[in-house]
Amino acid sequence: MREITRAADQRNTNALQYHFSDRTGLLRDLLNRHGETVDQHRGLLLNEIETDGEPTVRPLAQALVLPLAALLSEGRGPEYLQLTAELVARPVHFSQVVDFVTLRPSLARWSMLVEPFLPAEAVGRPLHRRFTAIRFVHNELGSRAKERHSRPDHRLFTSHLIDLVCGVLTAPASAETSALIEK
């Protein structure tokens, strides 16, 4: 909070604390600003997928990536992407706010639609393949957001990220991994 008041050239940290209560309240507010837009965009993409009939992996990967990738070119979007990358990379440390990123209604829907494409061993514990894909997307977009001034065209990056998400979701578990799961 001190950093924010310093950046805003303010001396009264009490006003900020009064408005947001604490750091968690501030993070919730920041996450909700873009999170609702991302959730709505993803929801529309999922509606299209369900309307088109039997879902396939690539459109589902697009539904995960595209709403977030759109933020690379929008106002404070890059800062949001960097923040969510940090939160998702350390979910235990940020347990009070990470759910504002990972438990959005559209992500719950996406998780159900993508489950049939996952190898059986990758559903739920201990591998959590869907969360791995979500964390990977946030990490990659957060890294890209840091370089936004040097790379203004994000189309190739976004398409490649979608390809990688398809691979993350559908890659079979190796014999070694399967054996370790059974131990």
Provide a role label for each language-model segment:
Residues 1-25, 29, 33:
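Helix-turn-helix
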Residues 12, 24, 88-93, 137-142, ...:
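Short alpha-helix boundary/capping elements
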Residues 30-42:
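Generic hydrophobic, amphipathic alpha-helix propensity
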Residues 43-80:
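Hydrophobic alpha-helical connector segments
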Residues 45-52, 91, 95-98, 141-148:
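Secondary-structure edge/capping motif, primarily at the C-terminal ends of alpha-helices
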Residues 78-79, 92-118, 127-128:
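Amphipathic alpha-helical packing segments from all-alpha helical-bundle domains
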Residues 82-89, 123-144, 156-167:
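Hydrophobic alpha-helical segments that form the core
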Residues 147, 170-183:
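Long amphipathic alpha-helical segments
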